[in-house]
UniProtKB/Swiss-Prot annotation:
UniProt keyword annotations, A-Z: Chaperone, Cytoplasm, DNA replication, Metal-binding, Repeat, Stress response, Zinc, Zinc-finger
Native source organism of the sequence: Bacillus cereus (strain AH187)
Function: Participates actively in the response to hyperosmotic and heat shock by preventing the aggregation of stress-denatured proteins and by disaggregating proteins, also in an autonomous, DnaK-independent fashion. Unfolded proteins bind initially to DnaJ; upon interaction with the DnaJ-bound protein, DnaK hydrolyzes its bound ATP, resulting in the formation of a stable complex. GrpE releases ADP from DnaK; ATP binding to DnaK triggers the release of the substrate protein, thus completing the reaction cycle.
J domain mapped to chain residues: 5-69
Gene that encodes it: dnaJ
Pfam families referenced in this protein's UniProt entry, alphabetically: DnaJ, DnaJ_C, DnaJ_CXXCXGXG
UniProt-recorded name of the protein: Chaperone protein DnaJ
Length: 371
């Protein structure tokens, strides 16, 4: 697709003056700027206007264009992408940020109160500690207001002074030349780092920062039922606020060690209980460990391996107080690796019988129990 004539793009004749070119560009650039225009092809038109101005505003490029057209204008001058600059470190984005609320926008008061940073602390608990909860005293490295200068950063007996360069505003005005004329931008004052205040005599303890690094002891209550990976928020125990703002928060992340017998799924506790073939086949009553103590569990005769039994209320308490979980006991048959001659004979007898009677079951039970 052939390019349009640059003079036509800007709506000008070939004899247009530099001032006319600048005015036309300024009007069209504002009209087609993507942040303002709702036209469907605004971006393409904006780029076209930008490219035309880049050539016609430069005497050498304009002369090449007038003599050779687009081929001459593009010879040795590179492309005309959206990131082109006018020179002097001031580009198109700077110009339009000034027009549409960028550099000239309202800035935050540098001396306004601000909340301190949040902190994170990792803690590892045993399985039972997570179930029943625990109270901990932890030491956290924090930045607190300096006791010597009371957080001002100034040497005791002295005070901060208003910055003369920005009159205490924390901002200074910077003028820059653009194709649209002079633009005044506001930026942070380099003399006071945007605070509006100067510390002439710094505190020797904190060296003017107003803060010192220290370790603070904090009491943390771990709620019953907390699970691995959950965190506790301790309000106001983070870093100190700035300019009188509130302190941040402390987040305690909990890790729970694995247990050799129990596993956890939400508020429920899972365990596997090994039983003998005789206990599964003939039934039995066994003691099952729980985090609340041992309980009796009746195993019905003919129980299959993998059967799950529920012990109501023997799980973990819900961390938010919504009831109590259960414990699920999965029974697994344990095949003996060493059998006596009597046990082997009874098993062979059992395997050879099509119909079992009570006398055989009794013999098996006594044999596996060593009676």
């Amino acid at each position: 697709m052939s390019k349009r004539d640059y003079y036509e793009v800007l709506g000008l004749s070939k004899g247009a003056s530099k001032d006319e070119i600048k005015k036309a560009y300024r009007r069209l650039a504002k009209k087609y700027h993507p942040d303002v225009s709702k036209e469907e092809n605004a971006i393409e038109k904006f780029k076209e206007v930008q490219e035309a101005y880049e050539v016609l505003s430069d005497d050498q490029k304009r002369a090449q264009y007038d003599q050779f057209g687009h081929a001459g204008a593009n010879q040795g001058f590179g492309g005309f992408g959206g990131g082109g600059d006018f020179g002097g470190g001031f580009g198109f984005e700077d110009i339009f940020s000034s027009f549409f609320g960028g550099g000239g926008g309202r800035r935050r008061d540098p001396n306004a109160p601000r909340q301190g940073a949040d902190l994170q602390y990792q803690v590892t608990l045993d399985f039972e500690e997570a179930i029943f909860g625990k109270e901990l005293n932890v030491e956290i490295p924090v930045e607190d207001p300096c006791d010597t200068c009371k957080g001002s950063g100034a040497k005791p007996g002295t005070s901060k002074e208003t910055c003369k360069h920005c009159s205490g505003s924390g901002q200074v005005s910077v003028e820059q030349n653009t194709p649209f004329g002079r633009i005044v931008n506001r930026q942070a004052c380099g003399h006071c780092s945007g605070t509006g205040q100067i510390i002439k005599e710094k505190c020797t303890t904190c060296h003017g920062s107003g803060k010192v690094r220290k370790r603070k002891k904090i009491n943390v209550k771990i709620p019953a039922g907390i699970d691995n990976g959950q965190q506790i928020r301790v309000s106001g125990k983070g870093e100190a606020g700035v300019n009188g703002g509130p302190a941040g928060d402390l987040y305690v992340v909990v890790h729970v060690r694995n247990h050799e017998f129990f596993e956890r799924e939400g508020d429920h506790i899972i365990c596997e209980m090994p039983l003998t073939f005789a206990q599964m086949a003939l039934g039995d009553e066994v003691e099952v460990p729980t985090v609340h103590g041992k309980v009796k569990l009746k195993i019905p005769a003919g129980t299959q391996t993998g059967t799950e039994f529920r012990l109501k209320g023997k799980g973990a308490p819900n961390v938010r107080g919504y009831g109590q979980g259960d414990q699920y006991v999965v029974v697994r048959v344990v095949v003996p690796t060493k059998l006596t001659s009597q046990q082997k004979d009874l098993l062979r007898e059992f395997a050879g019988q099509e119909e079992q009677d009570d006398s055989l079951f009794g013999k098996l039970k006594r044999a596996f129990k060593g009676e």
